[in-house]
Structures are given as structure tokens and as C-alpha cells.
Amino acid sequence: MINHNIISFKKFEAIFEQRPGGLELNMPIEIGSNNVDLTSKPFNIKGGSHYKVKIGYMASEPITDLICQIHTFRKSTPYGRDTQKVGDICANTNDLEFDFPKFGWEQASTQSSSMGDYTIKMYFKGNGNQDLATFFYSFNVAPDWENALPIN
């Protein structure tokens, strides 16, 4: 069960190393929510391109040992898992950002068998493995940049 109001999300951005139409793709979210689900609004990534995501959030209380567990699904099948340590957060901090990956870039596969829909489910935990927030989003790996804007 999620402990409400400790983490509140403010923004979601997909950042690309190269992309026609701009390097940043901002997706609107409900500001102040600790449970964001953007899976119905996927964005497209060209196979072989480098990208990362940036999530803006705020914390209303101190958080010890904040981690983000990242679960990747391809066509609803578990595909991979990762955990990224965020660390300790002070109370009433408004301008925090979570970057994934923290260093470098993710690269979308160029193999035709890897093209298709992906869903990322991020679970933010802290204060002794307490569930604090969830953030879900989807993207489609395609052979080109056609329809690079989010699908509404």
C-alpha cells in the first residue's frame, strides 16, 4: 500500500540524444499525484537511438534510502529489472529530479525482433522498503522516427 503524500510528481520528460522535432519530449501529468500512469499515451523511439527519462518530483517528509525499482515489460511479458538508488531526501524539497539511467543513455534495440511496445513500471520505495509512489509509462520502438510525438 502506498503511503500517500510523501512523494508527489511534477513532470515527465523523455530526452533524446538525437530526434527530429527537438531533443526533449514533455508529457503532461497530473501534478501532485503519487501514482502516475501514462501507459495509454506511449511515445515512439527509433531503434538504435539513445534516450533517458527525467521525472520531476517533490518530497513532503524526509525519506531515508530512497530507491526506484524499475520493471520493464515487452508486450505484457516481463523483460528486465533494475534498481537505482536515489539516497536520502530532506523534507519539503520541491525541485527534485530522477534520471534513468542516472549516467549515460539507454539505447533502443535495432533488432526487428525487439521492435514493439514496452511498458516501464517504476516503484519508489524508502523508509525501510515502504511503498511511496509509482510511475508507469510506455513507449514503442519503431524502425524510424515517424509519429515521434505521443499518441493521444
UniProtKB/Swiss-Prot annotation:
Gene Ontology terms: biological process: regulation of Rho protein signal transduction; Rho protein signal transduction
GO function terms (MF aspect): GTPase activator activity; Rho GDP-dissociation inhibitor activity
InterPro entries for this protein: Ig_E-set (IPR014756), RhoGDI_dom_sf (IPR024792)
Gene3D superfamilies: Coagulation Factor XIII, subunit A, domain 1
Highest taxon above the source species: Eukaryota
Gene Ontology CC, one term: membrane
Subcellular location: Cytoplasm
Keywords on record: Cytoplasm, GTPase activation
Protein family per UniProt: Belongs to the Rho GDI family.
Function description: Regulates the GDP/GTP exchange reaction of the Rho proteins by inhibiting the dissociation of GDP from them, and the subsequent binding of GTP to them.
Listed name of the protein: Putative rho GDP-dissociation inhibitor 2
Lineage start: Eukaryota, Amoebozoa, Evosea, Eumycetozoa, Dictyostelia
UniProt gene name: rdiB
